[in-house]
Regions:
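Residues forming the flavin
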Residues: 2-432, 436-494
Length: 494
């Protein structure tokens, strides 16, 4: 069998010998999908941008640097069994592999383009697969406030990754601001790690609990209730919590020096060395968008997500999305969705019939219903307020190109009707992040100026490569037979 040797000793099949399924992402959804697919006799390759399996939620699970396991909650440590199940499944694992493109061949196979290696010596190669499961996870929602580009301002997610992967915690004064479960979770983890959290500035709007009350029954009967109550009590007992914060700004000359905020109509400042911001996470849609999958606006979660069926199937044949990449559902539900997507692939490729697929999916579907119980309550309670999703004035929106909210709003008033036109007006979304930091904010600002829903505005039209790629690396990519034939057909017409 032809094989291709990568840097670091990882051996992959030649693109002429396809895998049955390629899984992108090694979080709970990807790990479960790969293990289930391999268990059904499918040749499976798991492509992971990180150095070790676990994704963001289980980052560092295979070799945690933390001496005190109690700093991270029990939900984190259960990821170890998921990683073990994957490792013994027989699936091929490719770490540090950034998937930057996917192309469908005329014969229905998918060419997955990935980059791997050390900085300055990366190589791009093709992996062919009959089916694709995208489990690329989520990223934090943009939280553009005045001064958020100052040194000393980070996201809560970035701070938690430092804690999980290297055991690093801040040494000076720290303030957390925003809304959502992760904000409170990090505060509790910091307290256990001995970090002094000076304040937690809660941006959850007044009256939001009343709005979420219609979903309270599901929440009260879920596992989230007891965990959430315990978390809130731990933090409130030891941290100054300021509720109903309606304005935030980071201030300082060359680095963060203080946080200015307004709550209940009263303005105040806090001197601090570190400000950690968070207002929820959103699906990572860059890959599925560039592939051409249909997407829709989720009003409750205020984000775009791929259109999927009950198995995670998208509008492209044999392409599935599992986990938070398809809509925020949490780690447990993501794992179950990975199982379901793999069962659908096994059925689609003829390894199991529909009756077997449905029988094996019965218990996972019950588990999925349990895992999603209470999710609607969180989505309603912690939906970020408009004021923090739609900044104004000189607040930087696009960090890559240093474009302000006022510039985006002005372009919209001058006739720019959507994010793709905005690229021509201001280059928003054309930097290295490809819209991850600004995409939703740009959409929301245009929607505000036009007086329409973000669904009517849409999102950036993304193209490959979806991650930064050196031109030399692209030029060295081995050509496929289809690409060579395309050149022959083109040159033959002249």
């Amino acid at each position: 069998m032809p094989e291709l040797q990568f840097l670091g000793g990882v051996t992959l099949r030649d693109d002429r010998v396809p895998y049955d399924v390629a899984v992108v992402g090694a979080g709970p959804a990807g790990l479960a999908a790969a293990a289930t697919a391999a268990a059904h006799g499918l040749s499976t390759v798991l492509l992971d941008e990180q150095a070790a399996p676990g994704g963001q939620i289980y980052r560092g699970i295979a070799a945690s640097p933390l001496r005190d396991a109690g700093i991270l909650d029990g939900d984190y440590w259960r990821g170890g069994s998921l990683v073990h199940a994957f490792r013994v499944s027989g699936a091929t694992y490719v770490p540090e592999a950034a998937v930057w493109g996917v192309a469908r061949r005329e014969d229905g196979l998918y060419d997955v383009m990935l980059s791997r290696g050390t900085p300055g010596a990366r190589q791009s190669r093709l992996v062919a697969a009959r089916a694709l499961i995208v489990a690329a996870g989520a990223h934090e929602r943009p939280f553009a406030i005045p001064g958020w580009t100052l040194p000393g301002v980070l996201s809560v997610g970035a701070a938690q990754l430092l804690l999980k992967s290297s055991g690093q915690v801040p040494a000076g004064r720290a303030v957390l601001a925003g809304c959502g479960p992760l904000l409170w979770l990090l505060a509790a983890q910091y307290l256990k790690a001995g970090v002094a959290v000076d304040a937690l500035l809660d941006t959850t709007p007044r009256g939001r609990y009343a709005e979420a009350a219609s979903h309270a029954l599901g929440f009260l009967t879920s596992d989230y209730f007891a965990k959430g109550l315990r978390l809130l009590r731990e933090v409130r007992a030891r941290v100054k919590v300021v509720e109903h914060v309606t304005a935030l700004a980071a201030e300082g000359e060359r680095a963060l020096e203080r946080v200015r905020y307004e709550a209940n109509g009263v303005a105040a400042t806090l001197d601090t060395d570190l400000l950690l911001l968070h207002q929820g996470i959103v699906p990572g849609v860059n890959l599925t968008s560039a592939m051409g999958c249909d997407h829709r606006w989720n009003e409750m979660q205020a984000s775009f997500e791929p259109v999927r069926d009950a198995w995670g199937g998208t509008t492209l044949p044999n392409v599935f999305v599992a986990g938070d990449a398809g809509g925020i559902v949490g780690a447990e539900a993501s794992e179950v969705q990975g199982h379901l997507a793999a069962l659908a692939v096994a059925n689609g490729l003829g390894r199991i019939d529909a009756r077997t697929r449905d029988a094996e999916a019965a218990e996972p579907r019950r588990a999925l219903a349990r895992a999603l119980r209470g999710r609607a309550f969180f989505d309603s309670l912690y939906r970020p307020p408009d004021a923090f999703r739609r900044p104004v004035g000189d607040t930087i929106v696009c960090r890559c190109e240093e474009i302000t909210a006022a510039q985006v709003a002005d372009a919209a008033r001058r006739g720019c009707s959507g994010p793709n036109q905005m690229k021509a007006f201001l280059r928003c979304g054309m930097g290295p992040c490809q819209g991850r930091f600004c995409g939703l904010t740009v959409t929301e600002l245009i929607a505000r100026e036009r007086g329409v829903s973000p669904a009517a505005v849409g999102y950036f039209r993304l193209r490959f490569p979806v991650t930064p790629l050196a031109l030399g690396e692209l030029a060295a990519l081995p050509s496929t037979e289809e690409a060579e034939q395309a050149v022959v057909r083109t040159t033959g017409t002249h």
